[in-house]
Design a protein with these regions (language model features):
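Short N-terminal secondary-structure initiator segments
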Residues: 2-27, 109-122, 305-323
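N-terminal short beta-loop-beta anion/metal-coordinating cradle
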Residues: 48-79
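Conserved small/polar residues in nucleotide/adenosyl-binding loops
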Residues: 357-359
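Cap/lid and interdomain-hinge subdomains that line or gate substrate/regulatory clefts
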Residues: 28-42, 52, 68, 72-74, ...
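Short, glycine-/Ser/Thr-/acidic-enriched flexible segments
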Residues: 45-47, 81-84, 155, 247-248, ...
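N-terminal signal-anchor module of multipass membrane proteins
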Residues: 5-19, 23-24, 30-52, 79-82
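Long, low-complexity, Lys/Arg-enriched
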Residues: 2-4, 54-55, 60-61, 84-86, ...
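Conserved, well-structured core segments that form the ligand-binding/active-site neighborhood
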Residues: 165-352
Length: 359
């Protein structure tokens, strides 16, 4: 396995600054010609955090897919929450999704591109979900998938891909993803930080690292659309494509190249973070929500913050909230009670009684 090192945050500034105006002009031109609906299957509720004014469905019936495909929106989300499923359950659900999506597409005549939105720290049912979707959709529709695009870059969370190595920002340091607590997840553990090796690891060698196609930062910063497009034109057999990115302009250059390859008949599925959804869906930037965006000026009622995660970073965030906002009331749910029906019922009553005191 390739040896990778921690890197200073200054590494992100090692490439020439992108020409943002030129990048987005080219992207708009290609999006204008793109006639496919963007369908986002989200394995966790956090996937909508980079978008706004989009529909989010919480079921995957044929009627739901028809409604999404027939809408005037460029994209829509279907929240599967499948990261919490067993392998068997997510297989069953994704077969059902493929069946209903294929039927809806055939009946509406609306083509689509699929984004399997997942974790920017590489946790999730990969390659199970996208392999299941590919197999089922190819059995139901005439299209054949040439490849799968892996794009886990997520600026807002400090997740960057450089020279195929995926990093997680921790303070002023870029830590290879395989060395973080996320890689030690009890369900989705992995070792490789180089995404080409990660593909080989997660697919059990079905897609060897040396055969995975890589889109470099140098190509993207040069805006070498032709070179990137030709790489995509050469992909077949559902081979994996790793996209390096450290800013949204890098994603935009890649998406422009992808759109040109798609116009020439290439068919890809995406597996990535929320960033690629925002770019391919042409979702505009929007500032963080303010108090006045959420409630009337004279509103005195409070709100509920629900925190639930087993990773250390979330614990640190909660501790910072407790220290900075001592006026908030904190109620801790005893998760160990979920294994006993009577204990769980008692804990539920306790939490409800405590909550009612503060409402």
């Amino acid at each position: 396995m390739r040896a990778v090192q921690h890197q200073p945050i200054s590494l992100l500034d090692s490439w020439p600054a992108p020409d943002t105006d030129a990048v987005h002009h080219a992207l708009r031109e290609e999006l204008r010609r793109f006639d496919r609906k963007v369908v986002v299957l989200d394995d966790d509720p956090t996937g909508v955090q980079t978008v706004h004014d989009v529909s989010v469905y919480t079921d995957w019936t044929e009627e739901t897919f028809r409604a999404g495909l027939e809408s005037n929106d460029r994209l829509f989300f279907v929240l599967t929450n499948s990261r919490s499923f067993s392998a068997g359950e997510t297989t069953r659900v994704h077969r059902e999704i493929a069946e209903h999506l294929a039927a809806a597409s055939q009946k509406t005549g609306v083509p689509f591109v699929l984004i399997s939105r997942s974790d920017s720290t590489l946790r999730g049912h990969f390659p199970l979900e996208t392999e299941t979707l590919r197999t089922e959709l190819e059995a139901l529709l005439p299209e054949r998938y040439d490849g799968e695009i892996l794009l886990p870059f997520f600026l807002e969370g400090g997740r960057y891909t450089i020279d195929n190595v995926h990093y997680v920002r921790e303070g002023d340091t870029l830590v290879p993803a395989g060395e973080t607590e996320f890689a030690r997840d009890t369900t989705f553990a992995y070792r490789a930080s180089d995404l080409t090796e990660w593909c080989q690891e997660k697919t059990g060698g079905a897609y060897p690292a040396e055969q995975v196609v890589s889109i470099s930062l140098d190509e993207l910063r040069r805006r070498d659309y032709d070179a990137v497009c030709e790489k995509l034109m050469g992909v077949s057999g559902f081979n994996k494509v790793v996209v390096n990115a450290v800013c949204y302009d890098d994603v935009a250059v890649f998406v422009t190249s992808y759109l040109r390859a798609a116009a020439r008949g290439k068919v890809f599925m995406f597996r990535g973070s929320a960033a690629v959804v925002k770019v391919l869906g042409a979702v505009s930037d929007q500032p963080l929500l303010r108090r006045e965006d959420l409630m009337c000026a004279d509103q005195r009622n409070g709100g509920i913050i629900i925190v639930g995660s087993h990773v250390r970073k979330t614990t640190m965030q909660l501790e910072a909230l407790q220290k900075g906002c001592p006026e908030i009331e904190y109620i801790c749910f005893d998760v160990n009670t979920v294994f006993d029906d009577a204990a769980l019922a008692a804990e539920r009553r306790r939490i409800l009684d405590l909550s009612l005191i503060h409402i």
